[in-house]
Amino acid sequence: MNFVISQHFNEIKYRFLYIFFTFLLCFIICTIYSESIMFFYVHPLINLTSMQGKHLIFTEMSEAFHTYIFLCFFTSIYCTFPYFFYQFWAFFIPSTYQFERLQLRFLSFFFFTLLFFSCIIIYFIILPEIWSFFLHFEKKSYYFNLQLEARISSYIQFTFQIFSYFFVLFQCPLFTHFSLNLNLLTISFLVNSRKYIYFLFLILAAFLSPPDILSQFFLFSLIVFMYELCVFYSCFYDSLRERIKTF
């Protein structure tokens, strides 16, 4: 018994070492190509402004250095996550039944699909809309000029916050699946509470998006679509579970 436990702990240790060295390698590569990675995150703003006479600034001696480290660190985490997931899968999957493996494969595919589409929508739609709204406050008049000179640290941190918020939002169908499995949610609750939940979504859209009607409507529509997708999935999942019980 002790031998088996020690084997498991040794395997966990080795897998965490693999993950650590993979993260370290990703961090080194990100550090080498940090300027290209910075351009990737700044690109939505560059497309809107063409950066004519504009520039990103840093107001403290070490601010640019800390921003590059922050950027490389979190980019390395995102790049290492699929490998971490693989190591997690390889450790736990031998102890599961066949039906559990099929379910985990479906959930894994579902998770990474939502993750991929959330990245695409955030980068190409949501971020440009947010920056476009804030850039409308630039003014050139006879009395004064008001122009954007964004701090690089504020820009990068705000961009990562937007990514984090919408990553969580796009995983709502997955959260719904686990809640249904644990009997924390029911289909009747999701359907009967729809109007109250829509009202909460409206407040959430007003909080997350800029105070622009089109942006708020777009975000509200996106959240409602995700909610209706959760309701549809819960109905499908419940009917599938009932069919399995009958066999």
Curated annotation (Swiss-Prot):
It holds the Pfam family TatC. GO terms for biological process: intracellular protein transmembrane transport; protein transport by the Tat complex. The chain crosses the membrane at residues 19-39, 73-93, 106-126, 155-175, 196-216, 217-237. This is Uncharacterized tatC-like protein ymf16. It is a multi-pass membrane protein. Keywords: Membrane, Mitochondrion, Transmembrane, Transmembrane helix. Coiled coil: none annotated. Belongs to the TatC family. GO terms for molecular function: proton motive force dependent protein transmembrane transporter activity. The gene is YMF16. InterPro entries: Sec-indep_translocase_CS, TatC. One of its GO terms (cellular component) is TAT protein transport complex.
